[in-house]
Amino acid sequence: HNDLRQLMVSTDPPYYDNIGYADLSDFFYIWLRRSLKNIYPENFSTMLVPKKEELVATPHRFDGSKQAAKEFFEQGMSKVCGQIHQYAIGNIPLTIYYAFRQNDMDEDGMASSGWETMLTAIITAGFSITGTWPMRTEKPGRSVSIGTNALASSIVLVCRKREAADATCTRKTFLRELKSELESSLAHLQASNIAPVDMAQSAIGPGISVYSRYAAVLESNGSPMT
């Protein structure tokens, strides 16, 4: 869009090493390059798809280090959210499609580091998450879901610039606000005909909506709550 003051961003970001997009693209790239390199020499200047800056956590690009790959992905995700925040305006929300998976929840129903990483990047950039909705984005009969009680394929995160960019609150204040809003929010979700299997992940929404109003929620000793 030529006018960045009216820029709308809706994105389905990469998820650690789940899909190697650039590697998959090589299959098509070599054939396209053969046909089009003389027409678009700048776009087809390399033998294969460039991969150095691809935002995925693939250890083989970091001498086999899973930790280095993880840090590259998380730092890159934070940088992306920060850049989006520079252009975001109040009346147009940012929407992010997060592919919430069965293994994103542990045995106690707690979210995994993948979920935490995404939320941290969004909040640190200065966004507040004002809405979360589960969305079925895969065919019900796909092979990985047959015979399972599969979660909704994605959660749509609706984000807006936080009104007070550096505001903080205490853990006590956060819990008080959460308690006052959670019951009505859950009732609204139940009235929306959300499938029971999706309710646990949907219930995360009201909580992170309150949490993301602040740049940090502080413990009694002044340290950030995680």
Regions found by a protein language model. Give the residues of each.
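S-adenosyl-L-methionine-dependent nucleic acid methyltransferase catalytic domains
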Residues: 1-226
